[in-house]
Amino acid sequence: MALERTFSIVKPDAVERNLIGEIYHRIEKAGLRIVAAKMVHLTEEQASGFYAEHEGKPFFPALKEFMTSGPIMVQVLEGEDAIARYRELMGKTNPEEAACGTIRADYALSMRHNSVHGSDSPESAAREIEFFFPESEICPR
């Protein structure tokens, strides 16, 4: 197993429902360490930059609208096989298909309002972390 970092977002729907602490508890209980975190309210420009790979897709405008609708929590997680472990903890994108006990099965309202985001590869983790956090803001534990 390899020590790695992944990127996570607690999305506006979960922040609005005061689920940050519950989600952080699950992250830490799963053996992942939060090594950087902050609350931000994305501008349309920031959302466009972060989700640039989806520009031109039919869901892009709605995605930007949702992700700019309220504050989000962004965090860097660190641990053994952090990417795979966090993706398992999140559950499938569609909460109806997510395994019982996963974040999305328990908290997601819909496929769009699915409470959390997590990087899907080492490359996307590096890009997403760099988008929000300079290395000086990450505190290995």
From Swiss-Prot:
InterPro entries: NDK-like_dom (IPR034907), NDK-like_dom_sf (IPR036850), Nucleoside_diP_kinase (IPR001564), Nucleoside_diP_kinase_AS (IPR023005)
Pfam families named in the record: NDK (PF00334)
Cellular component per GO, a single term: cytoplasm
Keywords of the record: ATP-binding, Cytoplasm, Kinase, Magnesium, Metal-binding, Nucleotide metabolism, Nucleotide-binding, Phosphoprotein, Transferase
EC assignment: 2.7.4.6
Residues reported in the UniProt entry to bind ATP: K11, F59, R87, T93, R104, N114
Subcellular location: Cytoplasm
Predominant localisation class: cytoplasm
SUPFAM superfamilies per UniProt: Nucleoside diphosphate kinase, NDK
Gene3D superfamilies named among the record's database cross-references: Nucleoside diphosphate kinase-like domain
Parts of the chain that traverse the membrane: none
Entries under CDD domains matching the protein: NDPk_I
Active site: H117 (pros-phosphohistidine intermediate)
Cofactor: Mg(2+)
Biological processes, Gene Ontology terms: CTP biosynthetic process; GTP biosynthetic process; UTP biosynthetic process
PROSITE patterns: NDPK, NDPK_LIKE
Catalysed transformations (reactions): a 2'-deoxyribonucleoside 5'-diphosphate + ATP = a 2'-deoxyribonucleoside 5'-triphosphate + ADP; a ribonucleoside 5'-diphosphate + ATP = a ribonucleoside 5'-triphosphate + ADP
Source superkingdom: Bacteria
A molecular-function term among this protein's GO annotations: metal ion binding
Matching PANTHER family: NUCLEOSIDE DIPHOSPHATE KINASE, NUCLEOSIDE DIPHOSPHATE KINASE DDB_G0292928-RELATED
UniProt family annotation: Belongs to the NDK family.
HAMAP family, per the entry: NDP_kinase
Function, in words: Major role in the synthesis of nucleoside triphosphates other than ATP. The ATP gamma phosphate is transferred to the NDP beta phosphate via a ping-pong mechanism, using a phosphorylated active-site intermediate.
Protein name as it appears in the record: Nucleoside diphosphate kinase
Lineage: Bacteria, Pseudomonadati, Pseudomonadota, Gammaproteobacteria, Vibrionales
Recorded name of the encoding gene: ndk
